[in-house]
Amino acid sequence: MARPKKVVKKKEKKSVPVGIAHIQASFNNTIITFTDTRGNAVSWASSGQSGFKGSRKSTPFAAQVAAETAARKAQDNGMRTVGIYVQGPGSGREAAMRAISAAGMKVAFIRDVTPIPHNGCRPPKRRRV
């Protein structure tokens, strides 16, 4: 006997006029997440998700494309003003910030939240190429 079909509710879009853009730029990838002011994710994108593979993920252009994608999704949810938190030493930091402001979003503030150790873990040894 056939089971009755489950009724699936369509995900309703949140209207979030003010939010926060978190840019996490590592040496290998750049991840951009747009959240509301309480920290709930509204949209996100990364260099890898945007179609870049391998060493091309760490380029500024890949970060720019990812930031444009995430900003477009956030604007669909009504986001107009953002504060930017940047974390990490990656090459995509500046490109991602520029792409967010170029997408038509008003940037309220930019804050660097890169964790700096007070002589914590031993860093990886230097590469000899």
From Swiss-Prot:
Alphabetized UniProt keyword annotations: Ribonucleoprotein, Ribosomal protein, RNA-binding, rRNA-binding
SUPFAM superfamilies, A to Z: Translational machinery components (SSF53137)
Gene3D superfamilies assigned to the protein according to its UniProt record, in alphabetical order: Ribosomal protein S11
Domain of life: Bacteria
Task performed by this protein: Located on the platform of the 30S subunit, it bridges several disparate RNA helices of the 16S rRNA. Forms part of the Shine-Dalgarno cleft in the 70S ribosome.
Assembly: Part of the 30S ribosomal subunit. Interacts with proteins S7 and S18. Binds to IF-3.
Entry protein name: Small ribosomal subunit protein uS11
Organism from which the protein derives: Desulfovibrio desulfuricans (strain ATCC 27774 / DSM 6949 / MB)
